[in-house]
Amino acid sequence: MYGIEYTTILIFLTSITLLNYILKSITRMMDYIIYRFLLIVVILATIINAQNYGVNLPITGSMDTAYADSTQSEPFLTSTLCLYYPVEASNEIADTEWKDTLSQLFLTKGWPTGSVYLKEYADIAAFSVEPQLYCDYNLVLMKYDSTQELDMSELADLILNEWLCNPMDITLYYYQQTDEANKWISTGSSCTVKVCPLNTQTLGIGCLITNPDTFETVATMEKLVITDVVDGVNHKLNVTTATCTIRNCKKLGPRENVAVIQVGGANVLDITADPTTTPQTERMMRINWKKWWQVFYTVVDYVNQIIQTMSKRSRSLNSSAFYYRV
């Protein structure tokens, strides 16, 4: 009887010792694997340069400021550049080979053939309906026109900032704007926007909610409308929904992979919506030339300096996606 008990105890102690040895062996093996893995990660991290999409650069820039005309020593081998220009530029140049010529000129500044895309738009109004900015860097050329100054300012505000937008059902709901960053953005072939502010009893202030003719008109037959109303007040809206889509949008911050180059005009357009803030010229630049070839030559000369005022992003702007960052 005692022999059986001693044997049981001996087996138990032996099992514990063996288990302890196995656990220590596994621990040493795991430590070896983990330390080796970390060593490999550290070595690779020093070799590989990863793209950081979260860098916020201090953005200033105006072609009114004197920049040194020089070529970057490091070519942008892994980036794409989109240059948007009005159709009047190609009409004036009237040369079927002009894009090839321009591509070769960009090559002298370090931009390989195939990395620069030249995209044409009809006019400011048409470009406002569905701006699509898909390249790593996007330069938009806008010819100054005193009759379209406000349209240019709205378009610049749209494409130079990131917006988070949601659809609005204006037939069922009232809407209010919560702060200065909250705007209603309407786009379409023809947008007429009317608003009626409401009091706490949901009665119209200076208007009848049942009669859109009494509403205040904030836009008439435009292609892009950024509507700003009194914050914290409910509004009944009337929009030409057959030809226009309105969205409730929140400005998230600057879209740093886009720059606007204004061609002509006495001063760079100010896109500041809030009158209490300092005027903004972030990534808004101006050059003055009568001929479009001179404009393109200047863009090529200064393209690398302009890119330095921007930040490469993986996001794109697409109106069909409610301008949301994708």
UniProtKB/Swiss-Prot annotation:
Changes after translation: N-glycosylated.
Subcellular location as annotated: Virion; Host endoplasmic reticulum lumen
CC terms in the record's Gene Ontology section: host cell endoplasmic reticulum lumen; T=13 icosahedral viral capsid; viral outer capsid
Gene3D superfamilies in the record: Glycoprotein VP7, domain 1 (3.40.50.11130), Rotavirus outer-layer protein VP7, domain 2 (2.60.120.800)
Superkingdom per UniProt: Viruses
GO molecular function: metal ion binding
Binding residues annotated for Ca(2+) 1, in chain numbering: 95, 206, 214, 216
Ligand binding (Ca(2+) 2): 177, 228-229, 231, 301
Matching InterPro entries: VP7 (IPR001963), VP7_1 (IPR042207), VP7_2 (IPR042210)
Family stated for the protein in its record: Belongs to the rotavirus VP7 family.
UniProt protein name: Outer capsid glycoprotein VP7
Classification of source organism: Viruses, Riboviria, Orthornavirae, Duplornaviricota, Resentoviricetes
